[in-house]
Amino acid sequence: MQRKVLYGVLLAAPFIGAYPVFVMKVLAFALFAAAFNLLIGYTGLLSFGHAMFLATAGYATGYSMQTLGFTPELGVLVGTVAATLLGLVVGLFAIRRQGIYFAMITLAFAQMVYFIYLQAPFTHGEDGLQGVPRGRLFGLLDLSNDVALYYVVLAVVVAACAFIVRVVHSPFGQVLVAIKENEARAISLGYDTDRFKLLAFILSAALAGLAGSLKVLVLGFETLSDAYWTMSGLVVLMTLVGGMGTLFGPLLGAALIVALEDRLGDIGEWLASTTGVAWFHSLGESATIVTGLIFIACVLAFRRGIVGEMVARIKPLRATS
């Protein structure tokens, strides 16, 4: 029932007052968080460099469409493939280590990628790629129409999330969970855990790249902020807020964080007029502080995230009913 309501709201969003570009931005980040959750929530690998896949796909899609004249479907494909190949290269090095060492290797690669994009001529440095055209999907559907693009993005994100669900519930996904819970036992059962972790890393990178390609298609630009380490931190926060290791948690976390960052100024103005505290007028300029406070609250108060806490509370009620 809840899923039907959610699907109904998403299908009707452009006609019930929702700003299509904002909702598409939320969908792109929701897919980014879901891709990251596949790695940390089900495989137990914490990456501090997932922003490099988002940015790589964004730059590849933007450049191929703006400079090479590729169609949207080819541009998205190029971006996703670029992120997948980068995931393969990084994964071959990173999976040889565990825990904090794995995280630091991904962070080191991400910083290296950031400085490459800062200097590379095709990224236009700090100016980024501006004015990326949306084009026509398969030469037929004009994506300059926000509503048309919205349904394309929605279909892609739903299909990608369905793919993640299928992966999680497949024998491959069960092996990933076994590696997360007890890698030594998985090895003793004869599984090549490094191979499974590498495949999970590549899948996560590819899906993060798909999110980056959709994002540049929606917004029409790609900047260095997508490659910076703070973007990797942001997707960690989205996953923690929603609920790590849950299917809907990262989607909810992404929606909340993106909405908060986008509407923080409006919230500050409302609080200032309600409470009379002038400081709230500058709340929109304090997004980093607010997200930091949210991160602390998650760690201290509800470590399982919103969806994780809800599931933990509902399960005993179902068992007793």
Give the role of each language-model region:
Residues 1-321:
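Transmembrane alpha-helices and adjacent helix-loop boundaries
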